[in-house]
Amino acid sequence: MAVVLERVARYAIPIGIGFTLLQSSIYDVPGGKRAVLFDRLSGVQKQVVQEGTHFLIPWLQKAIVYDVRTRPRNIATTTGSKDLQMVSLTLRVLHRPEVGMLPQIYQNLGLDYDERVLPSIGNEILKSVVAQFDAAELITQREVVSAKIRQELVQRATEFGIRLEDVSITHMTFGKEFTKAVERKQIAQQEAERARFLVEQSEQERQANVIRAEGEAEAADIVSKALDKAGGALIQIRRLETSKEVATALANKGAQVTYLPFGAGSNAQSSSGSGLLLNVNP
């Protein structure tokens, strides 16, 4: 039994040491990541290690793993516009490292490269671009401002080995004085629109009155011409129609009324020649 234990102890230690060395010489690079090897003798290796399982020399070499997937980051700053209005801006940046430049990124910036670079260049470019526009232009030409910021920021980030997939303005606010001035301007524009509407409405009503008056004048002219053409006959017809209406009204009130055509007898003549007989017994 003692011999067996001695043999186990004899082989267990080398096996354990070998297993430990093997385990420490293997490392994994997960999906969406890349690795950079640092050698204690030669420094950072230029080759970028791809995804998968790889070997290294324990103690002499160390693997530094980078996430190369696109990640979002917000950059906020407060600066002044061309007309000295205070503007607060927030940018949303989608970024990732250039895979081929990972060794240089590790040498110059380290693992927190985005924290070191993006806020600095973001604030620099935001202040530079915003200073080229008035506060009103920042609102009316927002797409132009955003495109200019994107162009300069992409170019600047490339110098540090960072690729920007998208840059957009997500938040923009102005100082209280400018906000109040914009509100006053909007109220003035609304009042001007209302006044213009009232003027147009009055003009339409005036035109309608003119058209109505012209129509009435034309109708009166037609009636006048008809009277001139028909002579007394038309007047006599109107008189008879009026007499009928009066007789109907009196009959409805209980009066005994007899209607005779105009000129139907001497007794039928009234002082006005209306052709009505009142209180006539049948």
From Swiss-Prot:
Pfam families the UniProt entry points to: Band_7
Record-linked SUPFAM superfamilies: Band 7/SPFH domain
BP-aspect Gene Ontology terms: mitochondrion organization; mitophagy
Any coiled-coil regions, as ranges: none
Span(s) of short sequence motif AIM: 106-109
Lipid bilayer topology: Peripheral membrane protein
Disulfide bonds: none
Locations listed in the record: Mitochondrion inner membrane; Cytoplasm
A cellular-component GO term for this protein: cytoplasm
Gene3D superfamilies hit by this protein: Band 7 domain (3.30.479.30)
GO molecular function (one): mitochondrion autophagosome adaptor activity
Magnesium keyword on record: no
Record-linked CDD domains: SPFH_prohibitin (cd03401)
Keywords associated with the record: Cytoplasm, Membrane, Mitochondrion, Mitochondrion inner membrane
Recorded family membership: Belongs to the prohibitin family.
Subunit structure: The mitochondrial prohibitin complex consists of two subunits (phb1 and phb2). The subunits assemble into a membrane-associated ring-shaped supercomplex of approximately 1 mDa.
Function: Prohibitin probably acts as a holdase/unfoldase for the stabilization of newly synthesized mitochondrial proteins. Involved in mitophagy; may act as an adapter for atg8 that supports mitophagosome assembly. Negatively regulates the proteolytic processing of atg32 via the i-AAA protease. Acts as a negative regulator of the m-AAA protease.
Protein name, per record: Prohibitin-1
